[in-house]
């Protein structure tokens, strides 16, 4: 799948524009602050209904505009296309449209337009809180396991009920037991989905990493959020008093984590920023491989500031892997000379110059 058309209005400093990107490689180049990252942000908004630069959408709206809007036409892997649209105004109204109909949730966007982001903050996947790694893990599970979303919603509902009575004691014993059973059932299913996903991801990740950098002894493991030797029901019963003191459930899939270690050490503690970025790139490219195997369609990669913290050899290796995925890629850089060359002759490459929010296509992939 790929975006064949993108229209952007009212996003940051960007002038209104309609782009016809290449189905493969798209390079956006220009000076820092010109608006390159805002193009990626607009595509991210279209696919996830969130910005990767701000937790709020109000700053995304151009200061002279009442709202921001992004439309896109997605060419589907199975044939045909789907039209997506998102808009957000200054009063907080947010609208998602899919093929002319209002969508129920952002998950519907994500299902049609799976996106992967690689940017200067990527190292947070290793250094950041477990929540970031759970989001990475569950993105992958969501795209390969059709039952995940329904089970996830059941888990969240049961967890919310249990945490509420832990804080307020509002449920009788029978209701407490019923919600505990529901929580344990949903937790076991989520754990099963995640374990199966990690089992499939690990060999692909290891192979991908070996093509980017040699890090002998790096291991990827999964912690499910409670003792692997015990049933969750047993753990919940034994920790009930402390859970009541804390006001929330301390064990379960909401505490899961991915652990990357180099020998006996946490990988984030001893890898350089450049090495961390390569590890994260390998993880995200491995996810793309799994999506293509299961869905017959590729995810789209948004790569912001590719040269950052990577030398020429590693940049070339990363570009080669992205090209081999045969997916659509949007890459930003200051100087396009390095990225303009080196692609296979049959790979369609489009170049876009971004200057003070204006975007000009300088090389058409159809030429």
Curated annotation (Swiss-Prot):
SUPFAM superfamilies: P-loop containing nucleoside triphosphate hydrolases (SSF52540). GO terms for biological process: DNA replication; DNA synthesis involved in DNA repair; double-strand break repair; SOS response. It comes from the Bacteria. Keywords: ATP-binding, Cytoplasm, DNA damage, DNA repair, DNA replication, DNA-binding, Nucleotide-binding, SOS response. ATP binds at residues 30-37. GO terms for cellular component: cytoplasm. PROSITE patterns: RECF_1, RECF_2. Pfam families: SMC_N. It is found in: Cytoplasm. GO terms for molecular function: ATP binding; single-stranded DNA binding. Belongs to the RecF family. PANTHER family: DNA REPLICATION AND REPAIR PROTEIN RECF. The RecF protein is involved in DNA metabolism; it is required for DNA replication and normal SOS inducibility. RecF binds preferentially to single-stranded, linear DNA. It also seems to bind ATP. NCBIfam families: recf. This is DNA replication and repair protein RecF. It comes from Pseudomonas savastanoi pv. phaseolicola (strain 1448A / Race 6).
């Amino acid at each position: 799948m790929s975006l064949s058309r993108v229209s952007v209005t009212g996003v940051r400093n960007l002038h209104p524009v309609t782009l016809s990107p290449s189905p493969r490689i798209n390079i956006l180049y220009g000076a820092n602050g010109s608006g390159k990252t805002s193009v990626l942000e607009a595509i991210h908004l279209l696919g996830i209904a969130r910005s990767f630069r701000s937790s709020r959408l109000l700053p995304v709206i151009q200061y002279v505009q009442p709202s921001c809007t992004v439309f896109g036409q997605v060419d589907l892997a199975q044939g045909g296309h789907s039209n997506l649209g998102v808009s957000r105004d200054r009063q907080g109204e947010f609208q998602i449209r899919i093929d002319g109909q209002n969508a129920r949730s952002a998950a519907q966007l994500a299902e049609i337009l799976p996106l992967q982001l690689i940017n200067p903050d990527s190292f947070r996947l290793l250094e950041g809180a477990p929540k970031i790694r759970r989001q990475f893990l569950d993105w992958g599970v969501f795209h390969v396991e059709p039952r995940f979303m329904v089970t996830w919603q059941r888990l969240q509902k049961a967890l919310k009920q249990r945490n509420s009575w832990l804080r307020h004691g509002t449920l009788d014993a029978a209701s407490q037991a019923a919600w505990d059973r529901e929580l344990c059932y949903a937790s076991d299913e989520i754990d099963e989905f995640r374990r199966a996903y990690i089992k499939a991801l690990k060999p692909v990740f290891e192979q991908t990493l070996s093509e980017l950098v040699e890090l002998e002894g790096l291991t990827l493991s999964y912690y499910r959020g409670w003792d692997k030797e015990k049933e969750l029901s047993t753990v919940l019963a034994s920790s009930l008093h402390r859970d009541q003191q804390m006001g929330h459930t301390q064990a379960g899939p909401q505490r899961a984590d991915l652990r990357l270690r180099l020998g006996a050490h946490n990988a984030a503690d001893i890898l350089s920023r450049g090495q961390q970025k390569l590890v994260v790139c390998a993880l995200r490219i491995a996810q793309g491989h799994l999506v293509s195997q299961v869905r017959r369609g590729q995810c789209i990669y948004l790569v912001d500031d590719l040269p950052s913290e990577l030398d020429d050899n590693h940049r070339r290796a990363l570009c080669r892997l992205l090209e081999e995925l045969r997916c659509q890629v949007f890459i930003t850089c200051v100087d396009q000379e390095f990225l303009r060359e080196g692609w296979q002759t049959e790979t369609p490459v489009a170049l876009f110059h971004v200057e003070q929010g204006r975007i000009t296509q300088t090389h058409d992939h159809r030429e």
